[in-house]
Design a protein with these regions (language model features):
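Individual alpha-helical transmembrane segments in multi-pass integral membrane proteins
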Residues: 2-91, 102-114
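Conserved hydrophobic beta-strand signature of PAS-family and PAS-like sensory domains
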Residues: 229-233
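PAS/LOV and related PAS-like sensory modules
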Residues: 206-227
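PAS/PAS-like sensory domains across diverse signaling proteins
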Residues: 227-228, 238
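Membrane-interface transmembrane-helix boundary segments in multi-pass integral membrane proteins
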Residues: 102-105, 164-187
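Alpha-helical transmembrane segments of multi-pass integral membrane proteins
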Residues: 7-15, 77, 126-149
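Juxtamembrane or sensor-core-proximal signal-transducing alpha helices
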Residues: 119-125, 178-208
Length: 239
């Protein structure tokens, strides 16, 4: 139970950082040819939205433990992708007017949400690597399809009367932030793995201790799961 919650938080933060980093790495390659920068508060809010909505989606999938919970949780994660993207675009300051194609905006939201809805049912179908990889690929497809469709919806008309805020974050500093985010994802994954290994070792030691106590008993002991015998102690085995 405890490790389940730990992995939920680790997964939410690492996935949220991954979604956020993917968007802003793509934004670093986007050059409108006029001065631009990023509003710090909205950039931070876009990261928080990605993490919180990913956590909410994963929690729904785990708590509901049903097909509906998995699909709805995946849709929430997909909605988090769209929320993060448009908050990130709201943070983008440029010396010009930003125009949006409403049809492509709606299409981008639907793509992210619908493909995201398929990612959790696939990734959490069972513990096999095949479905884990399938879920990861679907989540990647949700991120990429949303991002490129959404970027196709934007047009920028240069306007020299509009100025970028002096407090806006330049692209070079954003690159540093993305690098830190990527490093954080790796650290969180390693930390979660270390905690999981420690918990498994503790469980194994506790099982060995209980087995030793059972074998020390004079009476024969039999542990069953329904009609199936799971284990017996030495006294029962000699009967």
């Amino acid at each position: 139970g405890h490790m389940r919650h730990v992995w939920l938080v680790v997964s939410a933060i690492s996935t949220g950082f991954g979604i956020w980093s993917t968007h802003f790495i793509a934004m670093l390659a986007f050059s409108p040819g006029i001065p631009s920068g990023y509003n710090i508060a909205l950039t931070a809010l876009s990261l928080a939205a990605a993490i919180v909505l990913t956590c909410a989606g994963l929690a729904m999938a785990m708590v509901q433990n049903s097909s509906f919970g998995l699909w709805f949780g995946g849709a929430v994660v997909g909605g988090g992708i769209a929320t993060m993207h448009y908050l990130g675009m709201a943070a983008f300051e440029v010396e010009g007017t930003v125009l949006w194609d409403p049809v492509l905006v709606v299409a981008s939201i639907l793509l992210g949400t619908l493909i995201g809805a398929t990612a959790l049912p696939a990734g959490l179908r069972d513990a096999s690597m095949k479905w884990k990889v399938t879920g990861s690929l679907l989540l990647t497809a949700a991120i990429c399809s949303h991002h490129f469709t959404a970027m196709g919806a934007v047009s920028i008309i240069p306007d020299p009367t509009m100025k970028v805020s002096p407090n806006a974050l330049p692209s070079t500093w954003l690159a540093v932030g993305v690098a830190i985010a990527s490093f954080t994802v790796i650290l969180l994954a390693l930390a979660g793995l270390a905690l999981d290994i420690r918990d498994q070792r503790r469980s194994a030691l506790e099982a060995d201790r209980m087995r030793g106590l059972a074998n020390a008993a004079v009476e024969g002991l039999l542990v069953c799961d329904g009609e199936v015998a799971v284990t017996v102690n030495h006294s029962f085995a000699t009967l």
